[in-house]
């Protein structure tokens, strides 16, 4: 979703919310939470508050009138009823015959509510310096995780990674072969953004940064001499991230045409730009997702930018066998998250079985 539309939607949801959610929103902006995260959370709050009114737990006439005491007094049984409602309500997707929403959606809803409750019971300071209330019912509600071993998840993900020489083959395909099948009209659009698209893909494959981190890069954040980029990680921390040297020519090519191609002036600080009717703007996450999906599907299999992050992490672990190094590269505080990559490249177990 484009930034302007996203902000418009956020304002629309904010206009519906009670005062304590607006305070929460303002507080999380300072962390900072991304606008995308806050938008998703506001959607979940709307769903939850509508249920409170429809179920009779709140007698408010509208969401904005819901009293904070309603949240304080919610019981574990109430929250379990809400989860049951999510599991059993008819799907809003016309093409789906499934009842209820997915477990992933339920977990996201509970995560959003946990964040709100933590703010109200621990983080906020009222006039007396104390939180608005102390009873956090969300601490009694557990989320159900998908039952899947790391080995099973690794095998599933492995099919969607560009490992070994496929990393460079993918870049070469976009640069030299993708255009062959295109119509003249499609070629015109492709040529306009070819250098930019290659630079973005190369940056993702060479650094493993998150999509949001790539989108928010400014010109000042990239040092091609040192092959380092400065990014804002989750939680707002600044971090310096190394890039593999294979990305340098793609980034140099893009930077050489950036200003003229995208009509960029001094005030246009974003690294990756789009241009519409002579006006440059920072590229948004959805545009990169569509772009990566389009090229990867034509090359081998449709993947997301996050799979390019997995690709870099797996290749780095394969080369170093160091989970610590991989976790630092990805911006993770612990090595637990990187356990997945040890399973993706675990050929020793297969070799041992072959030798039986």
From Swiss-Prot:
Lineage: superkingdom: Bacteria
Subcellular location: Cytoplasm
Domain Tyr recombinase: 169-354
Recorded family membership: Belongs to the 'phage' integrase family. XerS subfamily.
Keywords in alphabetical order: Cell cycle, Cell division, Chromosome partition, Cytoplasm, DNA integration, DNA recombination, DNA-binding
Main location, first listed in the record: cytoplasm
Designated name of the protein: Tyrosine recombinase XerS
Regulation: FtsK is required for recombination.
Active site: 210, 234, 306, 309, 332, 341
Residue ranges of every copy of the Core-binding (CB) domain listed in the record: 16-121
Record carries keyword Secreted: no
Organism per entry: Streptococcus thermophilus (strain ATCC BAA-491 / LMD-9)
Pfam family, one: Phage_int_SAM_1
InterPro entries for this protein: CB, DNA_brk_join_enz, Integrase-like_cat_sf, Integrase_catalytic, Integrase_recombinase_N, Integrase_SAM-like_N, Recomb_XerS, Tyrosine_recombinase_XerCD
HAMAP family associated with the record: Recomb_XerS (MF_01816)
Gene Ontology process terms (BP): cell division; chromosome segregation; DNA recombination
One Gene Ontology MF term: tyrosine-based site-specific recombinase activity
GO cellular component: cytoplasm
SUPFAM superfamilies to which the protein is assigned, alphabetical: DNA breaking-rejoining enzymes
């Amino acid at each position: 979703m484009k930034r302007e539309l996203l902000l418009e939607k956020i304002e629309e949801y904010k206009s519906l919310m009670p005062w304590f959610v607006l305070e929460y929103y303002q507080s999380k902006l300072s962390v900072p939470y991304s606008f995308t995260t806050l938008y998703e959370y506001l959607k979940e709050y709307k769903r939850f508050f509508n249920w409170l009114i429809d179920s009779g737990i709140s007698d408010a006439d509208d969401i904005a009138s819901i009293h904070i005491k309603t949240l304080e007094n919610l019981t574990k049984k109430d929250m379990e009823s809400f989860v049951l409602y999510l599991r059993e309500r008819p799907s809003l997707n016309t093409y789906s015959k499934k009842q209820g929403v997915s477990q992933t959606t339920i977990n996201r809803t509970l995560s959003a509510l946990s964040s709100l409750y933590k703010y109200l019971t621990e983080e906020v300071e009222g006039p007396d310096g104390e939180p608005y209330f102390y009873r956090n019912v969300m601490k009694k509600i557990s989320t159900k995780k998908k039952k899947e071993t790391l080995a099973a998840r690794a095998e599933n993900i492995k099919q969607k990674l560009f490992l070994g020489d496929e990393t460079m083959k993918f870049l070469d395909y976009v640069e030299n072969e993708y255009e062959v099948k295109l119509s003249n009209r499609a070629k015109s659009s492709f040529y306009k953004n070819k250098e930019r698209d290659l630079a973005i893909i190369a940056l993702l494959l060479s650094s493993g940064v998150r999509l949001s981190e790539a989108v928010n890069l400014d010109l000042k954040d990239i040092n091609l001499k040192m092959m380092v980029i400065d990014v804002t990680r989750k939680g707002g921390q600044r971090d310096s991230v190394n890039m593999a040297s294979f990305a340098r020519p793609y980034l140099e090519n893009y930077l050489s045409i950036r200003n003229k191609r995208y009509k960029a002036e001094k005030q246009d600080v974003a690294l990756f730009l789009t241009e519409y009717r002579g006006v440059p703007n920072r590229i948004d996450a959805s545009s990169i997702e569509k772009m990566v999906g389009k090229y990867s599907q034509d090359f081998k299999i449709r993947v997301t930018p996050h799979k390019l992050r997995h690709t870099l992490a797996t290749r780095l672990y394969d080369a170093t066998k160091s989970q610590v190094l991989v976790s630092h590269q990805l911006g993770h505080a612990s090595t637990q998250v990187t356990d997945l990559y040890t399973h993706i490249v675990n050929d020793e177990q297969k070799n041992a079985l072959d030798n039986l």
